[in-house]
Regions:
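RNA-binding accessory domains that recognize and position tRNA/RNA substrates
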Residues: 1-185, 199-219, 224-226, 230-241
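Nucleotide-activated chemistry modules centered on ATP-dependent adenylation/adenylyltransferase
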Residues: 9-10, 34, 140-144, 150-186, ...
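Short beta->alpha connector loops
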Residues: 61, 191-192
Length: 392
């Protein structure tokens, strides 16, 4: 819902504002660059500036620009607004115009916030603005005022040299601007969890290098396509970064594990997987690995077994979904657009033993797994191919 004359998007950021002044300046610059890239990626005209303590997008298409801002990491919220002179008459005129165009029924409220030096305060804006809205609609409707639960809120932000009138605020993802942290290798399985974990890492500012292990006969025929689709969806949140999917051949190693390892087979596979990711991370300058594992979701993801697989790599393994319930992961996947049919069998289930250990001693795992396991991982990483994933 846009006010008449909307020409600006007021962008608010969260965690950026709690940093030291130097760090905040760097993060705001990165956020502005990411916003500009997001606008360009969606062919939305606009200029991104920092004025009056806010990041502002000046644009002839505020509706589309607000949507773009609301998909940018580091943005808490975005409001398409009309910019007016910061005097009471201009503000009340803009509120009256907005009421005439957008008010149709129900209760309304005026919510003003002010910063800077003016000859009025926020309460003056609320009173005068409320009167202006009422006068604009009382002949055609039966308006009501409800400050606690209005059907429509007329919002005003007043700054030293400008005021903004807006009727809605769109939530952004929050977090940190993408690129303010070092990159991580994101292990993607083609399932639901791993893209959500990658998205969460991106939300905290870490670019991701997507890595998919091709399980050969042990993987479903559509798993690579599902991983590619996940990367395509993630790429929409990172317009100034190339999220090419790297594919490591793992079919031979998995086949050997299936033939030679019993109840600890899945742990050895995950140790192999982590070591492949470590080699890829070294080659691309990533500083860690991010996975979609959650405590207790599978036998290999108990607190004891996670400790066993962690010992296969010297890199930190980040698990954003560690304590999430499955239904929350599914909902997050739907929200960010990476959800795929959860009833489709995940290929590595065929690798799982019938009676896996839930607390395998590291000594037993090492004893049972092939001596050449980590050499296979090195070979798989050396054979990685990069697949360019383009937006549909």
């Amino acid at each position: 819902m846009l006010p008449p004359g909307a020409d600006t998007v007021v962008v608010r950021h969260g965690d950026v504002g709690v940093k030291s002044s130097h760090v905040q300046s760097d993060m705001e610059r990165t956020l502005r660059e990411n916003l500009a890239a997001m606008l360009a990626d969606r062919t939305v005209p606009g200029d991104v500036d920092r004025e009056w303590g806010r990041i502002l997008v000046r644009t002839p298409e505020p509706d589309r620009a607000a949507d773009a801002a609301a998909d940018t990491f580091g943005v808490v919220s975005a409001s398409p607004a009309a910019s007016v002179s910061p005097d009471l008459d201009a503000i009340t005129d803009a509120l009256a115009d907005a009421a005439e165009e957008q008010y149709h029924e129900g209760a309304f409220a005026v919510d003003a916030r002010r910063a800077g030096s003016h000859d009025f305060d926020s309460r003056d804006v609320n009173r005068a603005g409320g009167d202006a809205v009422w006068a604009a609609v009382e002949d055609d409707f039966e308006p009501e005022v409800d400050l606690d639960d209005p059907d429509l809120t007329f919002s005003v932000e007043v700054r030293d040299e400008e005021a903004f009138v807006f009727l809605e605020t769109r939530d952004g993802p929050g977090g940190m601007p993408l690129g303010t942290q070092k990159p991580l290798v994101a292990l993607l399985s083609g399932g639901i969890d791993s893209p959500v974990a990658a998205w969460q890492a991106m939300k905290r500012g870490a670019p991701v290098v997507p890595l998919y292990l091709d399980l050969g006969d042990y993987g479903g025929p559509d798993h690579l396509a599902r991983a590619e689709e996940s990367v395509r969806k993630l790429d929409a949140y990172a317009p100034n970064r190339d999220l090419d999917l790297r594919v490591a051949p793992a079919g031979d190693a998995v086949g050997r594990l299936a033939e030679s390892v019993g109840r600890t087979r899945m742990l050895s596979y995950r140790r192999f997987m982590y070591r492949v990711a470590e080699h890829v991370a070294e080659s691309v300058g990533a500083v860690g690995v991010v996975t979609g594992e959650a405590v207790g979701q599978k036998s290999s993801q108990t607190t004891a077994n996670l400790g066993v697989v962690d010992r296969a790599t010297q890199l930190p393994v980040h698990r954003p979904l560690l304590t999430w319930d499955k239904q929350d992961i599914v909902q997050a996947a739907r929200d960010i657009g990476t959800y795929r049919d959860s009833t489709i069998e995940v290929g590595c289930n065929r690798l799982a033993p019938s009676q896996p250990l839930t607390a395998a001693p590291i000594e037993s795992v090492r004893k049972d797994e092939p001596d050449a396991l980590f050499e296979w991982a090195r070979e798989a990483a050396a054979a990685v191919e990069s697949t360019e994933v383009t937006l549909a």
